[in-house]
């Protein structure tokens, strides 16, 4: 088995462009037949594969997650990374995970799906032909991401919002919500948590530390990832975890 990828575009409302890369297990014995097209037939031995969708951080190119996609494919998954080009508010336009900011206001947050890219991306993947047609298990979908991508994943942990969702993960993401959206200082928003959740955090995350002014003006300890685990996940089924990584 070798890891190969195919590329696709998909449409998300109110964005400039959206592009994805789908990594899959390919048949090394089919390389000769793919010399002219570059499209290598799938290794069907482990199919149907669960699908993992990796949501990007702000202005983080999806190729930054290629290493993770390759490892997950080798472990038996099919993996999609993507870039959604849209508004960054005062910062202009750039790569986002795709989020409906209006859905994050204090009166409406957690009441409906805020991930604008996931539905269109799932539809686009389902419409693909060879080499992955019929080989992806759309009843076993995991979503997860880094930084803002992880936050969007956490806010959408409801299978009625993301078809086939069975679990979610986040690295450096949390649900302490910006005061600019009308939330109180240092407030943590509960998430649906209708599936198991894995939270990963760096023990000394400089990005999280540098962004504290978005969430609070006081001088209290700032650990939004741990607070998200303690206060936002109301699952209570012993199937969610917080993992702190040194560094």
At which residue positions do the language-model features occur?
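Gly/Ala-rich beta-loop-alpha elbow adjacent to hydrolase catalytic centers
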Residues: 145-149, 153
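Domain-level recognition of soluble alpha/beta enzyme cores
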Residues: 1-52, 64, 73-74
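Residue in the alpha/beta-hydrolase core beta-strand immediately N-terminal to the catalytic nucleophile
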Residues: 140-142, 167
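Conserved hydrolase catalytic core segment
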Residues: 158-166
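Alpha/beta-hydrolase active-site loop
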Residues: 100-138
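Glycine-rich His-Gly loop
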Residues: 54-58, 147, 173, 202
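Short substrate-entry loop that stabilizes the transition state in hydrolases
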Residues: 42-49, 54-91, 177-178, 207-209
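The feature captures the conserved acid-bearing segment of alpha/beta-hydrolase catalytic domains
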Residues: 165-245
